[in-house]
């Protein structure tokens, strides 16, 4: 019985990798060996950066909340502590959105935080 080399399977696998490497520069989208390494590295970057995106957005929200809080006479930490004391459960994403799009509502929350801190 002759040896089976699996040509169609190999071709399909290589075609799949080269399709994933579309748009890469130079030989990284042409040659299978180089493309395979680059696709693997690209997927590592994608995995890492999915985690980093969450951190980056949290940092952005905190920076926006801090800027708006200081315009209302509070620091970020005082605002968050005051909101916790006032039993106002608003997450940072929503607070940052209020700070950017609805300054009056954010100012009202800041006032409630101030009264809770004073009490």
UniProtKB/Swiss-Prot annotation:
Signal peptide location: none
Listed InterPro entries: Ribosomal_bL20, RIBOSOMAL_L20_CS, Ribosomal_protein_bL20_C
Cell inner membrane recorded as keyword: no
Gene3D superfamilies per the UniProt record, alphabetical: 6.10.160.10, Ribosomal protein L20
Pfam families documented for this protein: Ribosomal_L20 (PF00453)
Keyword Glycosyltransferase listed: no
Annotated GO CC locations: ribonucleoprotein complex; ribosome
UniProt KW keywords: Ribonucleoprotein, Ribosomal protein, RNA-binding, rRNA-binding
GO biological process assignments: ribosomal large subunit assembly; translation
GO molecular function terms noted in the UniProt entry: rRNA binding; structural constituent of ribosome
Family the entry assigns: Belongs to the bacterial ribosomal protein bL20 family.
Function: Binds directly to 23S ribosomal RNA and is necessary for the in vitro assembly process of the 50S ribosomal subunit. It is not involved in the protein synthesizing functions of that subunit.
Protein's name according to its UniProt entry: Large ribosomal subunit protein bL20
């Amino acid at each position: 019985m002759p040896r089976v080399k699996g040509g169609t399977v190999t071709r399909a696998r290589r075609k799949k990798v080269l399709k994933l490497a579309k748009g890469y520069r130079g030989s990284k989208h042409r040659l299978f060996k180089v493309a395979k390494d680059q696709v693997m590295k690209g997927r590592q970057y994608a995995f890492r950066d999915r985690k980093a995106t969450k951190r980056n957005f949290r940092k952005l929200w905190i920076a926006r909340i801090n800027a708006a809080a200081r315009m209302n006479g509070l620091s970020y930490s005082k605002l968050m502590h005051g909101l916790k004391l006032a039993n106002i459960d608003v997450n940072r994403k929503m607070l940052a959105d209020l700070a950017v799009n609805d300054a009056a509502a954010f100012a009202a929350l800041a006032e409630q935080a101030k009264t809770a801190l004073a009490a």
